[in-house]
């Protein structure tokens, strides 16, 4: 599921980046909402998480009580928001949606919590970006369904406890490691969403094509799925752009050839890599000899913020086997060199393999 800063002169639009960035653009929210499944049995992929959620929801319905608080983690675009909506629908209860950046003070959180009705679902996106005072208030709310409101200042201040209606919090995060331990521990169920397999993405593309009344062949759906970086949101976005190409420059039917031609226009290659991805690999290989290089150095080399490189480009590059992380920084793999059409030197291959083995044997997070 990123806003560009305003400048005096509009920047050039990177069409490929708009397609591949899994953070939804505001003008696409309505279309994406229309394509979302409404029930758990309509949700494609993430079978393990679906089975676990089904058990939790069935148990809660049998007891007539709200389910435990739920934490959903994983890269953007994998269905965290959709699953939160589905949980509320399966429980036949309202859902209130907010986000961590919108909760900057304890009072902001108190205002939201005190408006919840019994059994309501509160979806808190980007929960890792919530302000610390609000986090501390949330501990008590999650555990005892109560908030303590401080009235007054100084020695004369008093604390007024406010009882809350029992509710279910669903938190979503792309950065689980940034959540304090006490907050993580208060979630009764934690699920990590993984990148999707091509077969599941093909099913998603076919379903979305039916909803959009788009004619598509099996190999056309497979081609779009193959370039979708394991992410349903990107698959749906690519489908809509390929549909435009099919209607304007072809006969309206999305075939493999039409999908390939359309995605070439948007500079999305056969692996789903776009201009930023290739810039990261190019910097690592051509400028730094394959690494190791720190995140900040890579970001400067490609002209992006470190957060953009880390959250948008790197997750899929790691998964696709183009990058590895070592205690000394990022390194390009042999696959990255070959993807750029360059034969990797033996010393680079040896260093990358050694770094990989060190990280694997250590069993510790790398830098």
Swiss-Prot record:
Residues 197-267 are annotated as: Small ATPAse domain (RuvB-S). Belongs to the RuvB family. It catalyses: ATP + H2O = ADP + phosphate + H(+). The keyword DNA repair applies. It holds the Pfam family RuvB_N. The gene is ruvB. It comes from Acidothermus cellulolyticus (strain ATCC 43068 / DSM 8971 / 11B). HAMAP family: DNA_HJ_migration_RuvB. It is found in: Cytoplasm. DNA binds at residues 325, 330. The lineage of its organism: Bacteria, Bacillati, Actinomycetota, Actinomycetes, Acidothermales. Keywords: ATP-binding, Cytoplasm, DNA damage, DNA recombination, DNA repair, DNA-binding, Hydrolase, Nucleotide-binding. Homohexamer. Forms an RuvA(8)-RuvB(12)-Holliday junction (HJ) complex. HJ DNA is sandwiched between 2 RuvA tetramers; dsDNA enters through RuvA and exits via RuvB. An RuvB hexamer assembles on each DNA strand where it exits the tetramer. Each RuvB hexamer is contacted by two RuvA subunits (via domain III) on 2 adjacent RuvB subunits; this complex drives branch migration. In the full resolvosome a probable DNA-RuvA(4)-RuvB(12)-RuvC(2) complex forms which resolves the HJ. ATP binds at residues 35-36, 77, 80-82, 143-145, 186, 196, 233. Its EC number is 3.6.4.-. Mg(2+) binds at residue 81. It is an enzyme of class 3 (hydrolase). NCBIfam families: PRK00080.1, ruvB. Has 3 domains, the large (RuvB-L) and small ATPase (RuvB-S) domains and the C-terminal head (RuvB-H) domain. The head domain binds DNA, while the ATPase domains jointly bind ATP, ADP or are empty depending on the state of the subunit in the translocation cycle. During a single DNA translocation step the structure of each domain remains the same, but their relative positions change. This is Holliday junction branch migration complex subunit RuvB. Residues 270-367 are annotated as: Head domain (RuvB-H).
């Amino acid at each position: 599921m990123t806003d560009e800063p305003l400048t005096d002169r509009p920047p050039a639009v990177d069409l490929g980046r708009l397609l591949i960035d899994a953070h939804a653009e505001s003008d696409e929210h309505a279309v994406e909402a229309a394509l979302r499944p409404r029930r758990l049995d309509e949700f494609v992929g993430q079978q393990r998480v679906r089975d676990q959620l089904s058990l939790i929801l069935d148990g809660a319905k049998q007891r007539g009580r709200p389910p435990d608080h739920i934490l959903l983690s994983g890269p953007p675009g994998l269905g965290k928001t959709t699953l939160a909506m589905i949980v509320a629908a399966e429980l036949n209860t309202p859902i209130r949606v907010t986000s961590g950046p919108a909760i900057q003070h304890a009072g902001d959180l108190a205002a939201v919590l005190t408006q919840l009705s019994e059994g309501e679902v509160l979806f808190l996106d980007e929960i890792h970006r919530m302000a610390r005072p609000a986090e501390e208030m949330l501990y008590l709310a999650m555990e005892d369904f109560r908030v303590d409101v401080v009235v007054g200042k100084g020695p004369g201040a008093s604390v007024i406890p406010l009882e809350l209606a029992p509710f279910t919090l669903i938190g979503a995060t792309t950065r689980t490691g940034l959540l304090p331990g006490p907050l993580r521990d208060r979630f009764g169920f934690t699920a990590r969403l993984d990148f999707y397999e091509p077969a599941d993405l093909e099913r998603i593309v076919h379903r979305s094509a039916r909803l959009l009344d788009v004619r598509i062949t099996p190999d056309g759906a497979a081609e779009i799925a193959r370039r979708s970086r394991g992410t349903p949101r990107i698959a749906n976005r690519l489908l809509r752009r390929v549909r435009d190409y099919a209607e304007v420059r072809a006969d309206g039917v999305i075939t493999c050839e039409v999908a390939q031609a359309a995605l070439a226009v948007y500079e999305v290659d056969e692996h789903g890599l776009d201009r930023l991805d290739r810039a990261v690999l190019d910097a690592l290989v051509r400028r730094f000899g394959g690494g190791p290089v720190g995140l900040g150095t890579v970001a400067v080399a490609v002209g992006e913020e470190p957060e953009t490189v880390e959250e948008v480009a790197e997750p899929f590059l790691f998964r696709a086997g183009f990058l590895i992380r070592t205690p000394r920084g990022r390194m390009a793999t042999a696959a990255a060199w070959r993807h750029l059409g360059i034969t990797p030197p033996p010393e680079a291959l040896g260093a990358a393999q050694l770094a990989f083995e060190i990280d694997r044997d250590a069993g510790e997070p790398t830098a």
